C-alpha cells in the first residue's frame, strides 16, 4: 500500500507472492512469515526485505531475505537462515546515517535480544553482533535515532497477551542499552494499548515528527486486530512519551513545524532541495535599533539566511551572570530574522574567533591560570555546558522543528587550525545536540585540515576566501563524502591589518560559481559592524591588535551604507531567486556632520587613582579580578648610581614607564619591546609602569592571553664589568577598569594646559558636550588624540590610537539625542589638541606609524655568498600544501627561503603559509617567529608583508611587488635554536595560483645572516 498523507491508501499489489506448489518452501501457505521490514541500499540501489520466517510449530526461528528494484515489488526471495547461528524470531532492521545496516532480533528462545551488523549489500550478517537484555525476554524491537542517540521500543514475552512496553537508549547502536521505562501513557498504557511495537517511522520534512507503529491483537477479540499508530512526543528535558489519542490527524499534527537536513548532494528544507545564501552579521556589533534595517538590507541582496556567532564573553561577564537584554537580546534578533523571512544559522561557539576579544571566550576563565582552553579541561567544559544551556534557554525553542527560523547549529569553530582532538570536539557536539534536539549540526574548517576533527555524524563545511579555487577547496570533501551537500560556511569578503579592500569582481565570481553548481555559502562578512568598547581582538603569531571598525570591506559598510559591492552582488544574486522577486532595499540612514567642538574638562589620571592594592609580587590583571582597561604598577627603587637596564617580562600590551613622574619610554608588545635604558636615580625614586590591555588574541594557541605584566620587572646594573639583576618587589597596584562609571566619577577640572610641569602630555579623562538638532549617524574625528577609549552618552564606542589607520569612530544616531550629548575620552598618552568634530565619512585608512610595515632597511641586501643550502628543490604547480624533507636533520635558529623562479615565469612571488618540521616530523610552533628580512613586500594597497606567511590565515599571503625580479628571499628568526627536518609550503588559493614558487633553496644557520 502507498499513501501521500498517511490517511488515504492505495493498494499496490502483492510484493512477495506465496509459493503454493512446494510445501517445503518458506513461502508455502503452511509456513509463517511475519514482521517484514524493508530498507533501501544506496550502494546497490536495491530494496531489501527482512522477515521472521517460521514453521507452523514455531521451531524454525529463521530470518528470511528478499530483494527488489522497487518498494512495491515484486521481491525475489533469497532464502532463510539463522543469523550468527542463533534463533531469529521477532525482528527489525535499521540503517544508520553512515549507511551501515543492522538486524535486531529475539533469540535464545526469546530470552535475549541480538543486534547484528549486516554486510554492505544488506543480505547477510558480517559476524559482528552483540547480546543485549540477556534473559530479559524482550521481543518486537522497533528502533529509531533521535538527536544523536539510538532508541529501541520493545515488548515483553507473555504468550500472546499484551504487556508493558519498554524504551531503551544507547550512545552506540551495538550497545550498551539502558532501559528508560514505559513511554506509553493514558488508558491501557500498561498493556501498550493492547498492541505490540513493530516500527517507528520518522516523518521527513516535519521536524521532530515520529510515529510509533503497533500491531494490535486481543486474545479474546481477534476481530480487533488492527494497526495502532501514535505520534511520539519529545519533552524539553529529553523525555519521550507515547500518549494515547482516540484520534489524530497527521496532516495537522505537526503544523508549523519544519525540517532541515542534509540530503544527497543538497540540503533539504521541508523535504525539498534548498541552497543556503547566508549573510553573516553579528548582533552585538550592530545597535539594536538598527537590527531590522540591517537584516532587510541582507534580504534585499537576495539572501535567504542570516548566519551569526554567539559571543560567550558578551553574554556572561562574570561566572553565572548572564545578560540577554538590549544589545545582547539574541532571541529578539532571531525573531526579527524570521519576521523578515530569513532563516538562521546559529554558531554558539564556545569559541568563535571573529576578530573578537579572546575569540569570544570570557576573560575570567584565565583566573584559573592552569586552565586548558578549548580542551577537555574539567573546569572549561563545566563552564561551556553552563553557557550553552543558558543560550539554548533563549533560542532552542526557535528551531525550525519548533516553527522557528534556526535551521542549523555549528559545533565549535575551525578547530583544525587549533589542534587535533576529536574527543573534545565530540564533547562539544554532545552539549550542542542535547540543547538543540533534532537540529542539523555542522562543523566548519579549512580544506587543508577538516579531517583532523571531522565527526561522522555532522555535516562538514569549508571556509575560504574570495579568489579561491572553489573546485580545489571542495575536492577533499567530495572524495570522502561524494553525496554530501557542499557549503562554504565562511566566504571571506575582506581581511587585513590596515583597512584592507578586496575586488568586488573576485567575490562576485566566487559566489556566482558556487550558486551555479548548487553550492551553499555564507558571505563573511555581509555587514561587519563595530567592535564597540574593548571588544576588538588581536591576531597572532606576534601581537597585532584589531581596530574598532569591523567594516571588513563588506557589501554593507560599518554604518549600514550600501557599497558598490552591494549593488554588484545584488545584481549577481538576482539570477538565483527561483522565481521570487528580490525584496526592496530599505531606506538608508543619512550621516550628518557635527561642527568642531572643544573639550572643556579634564581629570588627570595620576590625580584620580583608585585605592591601591599592595602586593609583594607582580601579578596579572586577571589575578586582581580585572578583565579590561589599564593597570598601574608602582614601586620605589633602591639607589642606582649609574644607568641601568629595565626589563619587563612581559607588558601586555602597551606600557609607559615613568620615573618620579618623568616619562622614560614605552614598551609596545607589537614590536616585542621589553627593555628600556634607565637613568641613575636616588633611593626611594618612584617607578610607575602604566599598562594598557588591548584586545586579547582571538586565534590560535595564544588565546590564553593574560593582561598587565605577566611575569616580572627587573633592573640590571653593571658593576665592575659584571651585570647584577634585581627583581623588583613590593608593588602598589591600581586597577583602572574600563567602565563608564569609573571614568565619569573622576574629579574633573577645567582644562588649562595640555602639558604638565615637565612639558609632557597628560594621561587622563577628557570631557566635552556637543549639540545635535536632529540625531543621525556620524563619525567623530580623533586625529589629534593619543591612545585610549571613547564613551558617548555612556555608550562604549571603541578604541582610538594616533598611529591609525582608523582615525574616526562610528557614532550611531540612535545613541545620540536631540540637544546636548556627552563624550568622554580616556587617553593614556594625552591629546595634542582637545577637539573633535563629526564627519559624514569615516577615516579608516590613515596609517601613521614610525616603524615601516616592511622588513628591509634602506640599502640592506641579503648576502648568501658562501652559504650552503640544506635543501635545493622545486615545488609543484597548483593549489594545496606541499612538503619537502631535508636530506638530514639540521640545527639552527635562522632560516632563509630563497625563491629562484616562478611557476608562470613572471616576477611575483607569494606564500600563503609556511611551516618547518621538527625532529619528529611535526610542525614547529610559530609563536616565537619573527621576520628578519624580506627582499620585497607589497604593502601599497593591501598588507602583504612577509609575516603573513605565519599568521595562521590561509587566505592572506606574503607577496613581493610586481616590478621586483627574482630571486626573492625571506629570513625568519625562530626565536631559539631548533632541529629541523623539512618545510611545508602553501601557495595562494586562487585557481591561477599567482606568485606560485617553482625552484627554491632553504638555508639554516645558528647565527644571523649577513646583510
Region roles according to the model:
Residues 1-258, 303, 554-561, 577, ...:
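Carbohydrate-active catalytic/glycan-binding domains of CAZyme proteins
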Residues 233, 238, 256, 384-393, ...:
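Carbohydrate-binding surfaces of carbohydrate-active enzymes
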Residues 797, 860-866, 874-1011:
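Aromatic, loop-rich ligand-recognition surfaces of beta-strand-rich domains
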